[in-house]
Regions:
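Glycine-rich beta-strand-turn "strand-cap" elements at beta-sheet edges
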Residues: 1-10, 51-64, 93-111
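A broad, low-specificity signal for short, low-complexity segments enriched in glycine/proline
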Residues: 7-12, 29-35, 66-70, 109-110
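Short, well-ordered beta-strand segments in beta-rich or mixed alpha/beta enzyme
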Residues: 11-20, 56-84
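Compositionally biased, intrinsically disordered low-complexity regions
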Residues: 18, 23-26, 111
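Generic secondary-structure microfeatures
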Residues: 19-22, 43, 52
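Short, conserved charged micro-motifs
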Residues: 24-30, 80-82
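An amphipathic, aromatic/His-enriched active-site/gating alpha helix that lines ligand/cofactor pockets
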Residues: 34-46, 64, 73-106
Length: 111
């Protein structure tokens, strides 16, 4: 584990994978992008990008089973933590969570 002082000073990369429910139509899957777009105005976000899983070749280390991934960069851990409690974020999760059956989050200190 990294020293706490380093984690507090570094930028945070928030990487999220979403597995959408299989019964969703192609149109509903594309419409899910509204979830990501609704997060963009949140003041704590430094960068935000998202996309569908790439159809890359099958390899033992590759997992393309998710539908969408989201990558957000925060200036620091405090901004990350504030984002988690932000009303816009919480409202978006409440509105769109009916579309997924699994979510995995990886938070990383980056330089």
């Amino acid at each position: 584990m990294i020293e706490e002082s380093k984690a507090e000073k570094g930028q945070i990369q928030h990487f999220v994978m979403f597995w959408l429910k299989p019964q969703l139509t192609k149109a509903e899957i594309i419409q899910f992008e509204s979830f990501f777009e609704s997060l963009k105005p949140i003041k704590y976000i430094k960068t935000l990008s998202y996309g569908l899983a790439a159809n890359t070749p099958v390899r033992p280390v590759t997992d393309n089973s998710f539908t969408y991934s989201l990558t957000i960069t925060f200036a620091n851990i405090a901004d990350h933590n504030a984002y988690q409690e932000d009303k816009t974020h919480l409202d978006a999760v409440e509105k769109f969570s009916k579309n997924w059956y699994r979510v995995v989050v990886h938070d990383t200190v980056i330089s």
